[in-house]
């Protein structure tokens, strides 16, 4: 993957996480904070958090697992089948905001 494509996908991933966190935050007791840098994206809700790097995702309650943004716009998490970025972002936001 080219660095330019990676940057575009990384920015899109952060945007999707922000959008779904905001949407789910409307019905949640707490709102999410999304912190973005070239090295990581962190989604925080109270004491719970998710942290994405270009190669892994970890959470406040689980061990680190493999993570990858793929060239076709899908997300690969650990050994699971790849899924569309928007579907994965919605699921992560929902699970963090509405446990």
State each model region's role.
Residues 19, 24-62:
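Amphipathic, interaction-prone secondary-structure segments
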Residues 1, 5, 28-29, 83-84:
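Alpha-helix capping and helix-coil boundary motifs
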Residues 12, 16-23, 95, 99:
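Conserved short hydrophobic interaction patches
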Residues 1-17:
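Charge-rich, low-complexity N-terminal segments
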Residues 75-77, 88-99:
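Extended, compositionally biased alpha-helical segments that mediate assembly or anchoring
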Residues 45-87:
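Intrinsically disordered, low-complexity regulatory segments enriched in Ser/Thr/Pro
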């Amino acid at each position: 993957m080219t660095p330019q494509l990676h940057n575009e996908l990384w920015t899109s991933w952060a945007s999707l996480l922000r959008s779904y966190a905001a949407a789910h935050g409307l019905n949640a007791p707490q709102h999410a904070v999304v912190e973005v840098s070239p090295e990581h994206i962190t989604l925080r809700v109270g004491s719970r958090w998710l942290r994405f790097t270009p190669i892994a995702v970890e959470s406040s309650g689980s061990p680190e697992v493999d993570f990858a943004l793929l060239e076709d716009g899908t997300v690969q998490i650990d050994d699971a089948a790849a899924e569309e970025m928007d579907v994965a972002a919605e699921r992560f936001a929902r699970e963090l905001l509405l446990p």
